[in-house]
Amino acid sequence: MGYSYRQAGVDIDAGNQAVELMKPAVKRTVRPEVMGGLGGFGGLFALDLKKYPEPVLVSGTDGVGTKLKLAFQMNRHDTIGQDAVAMCVNDILVQGAEPLFFLDYLAVGKLVPERVAQVVGGIAKGCELAGCALIGGETAEMPGFYDEGEYDIAGFAVGAVNRPDLIDGSQIQAGDVLIGLPSSGFHSNGYSLVRKIFTPDLWEKNYPELGETLGEALIRPTRIYVKTVLPLIESRKVLGMAHITGGGLTENIPRILPEGLGIKIARSAWQVPALFTLLQRLGEVEEAEMLRTFNMGIGFVLIVHPEDVDFIQTQLQAAGEKCFVLGEVSGQSEGVSYL
């Protein structure tokens, strides 16, 4: 009797079972433009050319980094997929694009159908929050490649914007105003440092300033800003945007500025959430290091003309969204200055 693929560590039947388990969640993400269902060699999406007569496709790909280690150690697999979606769709939103569809890549050492379905369920939830369709993906069983119970996840998002509506920051000028939207925590960045300071023995501990266990605060999924920001983009009053990921406010905002411009941010403009101050205190992390590593409670930034600030604030408040006027664009020096 010769060897079988299953004996080598790859269970095709388990893969098929995982597909059946994930189908209901995937089905909830379908948009009218989607053609066909799961199981094809490629995902099909018919772009609405009435809505996008001059389409520019915007794409983004990302993973969730070492935040995965928390999911493994906490045995929490239902939200990490939302992180993967958020990291991709928030990036393409910066260019003014509406996310249209998403594909995922999940690699495992041993395929456990129920766990795979949990992960993909989180991806589907993220797609629902972003309004995009999950039109395909790949689940790869790779025996001997990952430790027991571990996996890796990555995503790929495609969106569209009409060419005249593309947002590239080129219209930003000195005196324009920064408006920040709150994050839900560390999002998916800085977890190598987070895990160095917040060791697993602390995750079940209740810190009064957090109002929950540390573990719950750490595993909370990345916010998806699409449905909050798209209406603002449609108002044509947004000059530039930044998704605050690795590098924090310090590194990410300058990426969208024309040459010769910088940013002045008032540190008193918002209260840094307790999760960040707790990490800074326990790890004795310097302020500058915090600001160039973490989002510090601000997950997304809009830049608008001064005369449009009230309009943007009113729109956000009507949508139940908090926002903070962080500072302004400066013509005096490049980079970010904290006041």
Curated annotation (Swiss-Prot):
It catalyses: 2-formamido-N(1)-(5-O-phospho-beta-D-ribosyl)acetamidine + ATP = 5-amino-1-(5-phospho-beta-D-ribosyl)imidazole + ADP + phosphate + H(+). GO terms for biological process: 'de novo' IMP biosynthetic process; adenine biosynthetic process. Pfam families: AIRS, AIRS_C. InterPro entries: PurM-like_C_dom, PurM-like_C_sf, PurM-like_N, PurM-like_N_sf, PurM_cligase. Keywords: ATP-binding, Cytoplasm, Ligase, Nucleotide-binding, Purine biosynthesis. Pathway: Purine metabolism; IMP biosynthesis via de novo pathway; 5-amino-1-(5-phospho-D-ribosyl)imidazole from N(2)-formyl-N(1)-(5-phospho-D-ribosyl)glycinamide: step 2/2. Its main location: cytoplasm. Belongs to the AIR synthase family. This is Phosphoribosylformylglycinamidine cyclo-ligase. It comes from Desulfitobacterium hafniense (strain Y51). The gene is purM.
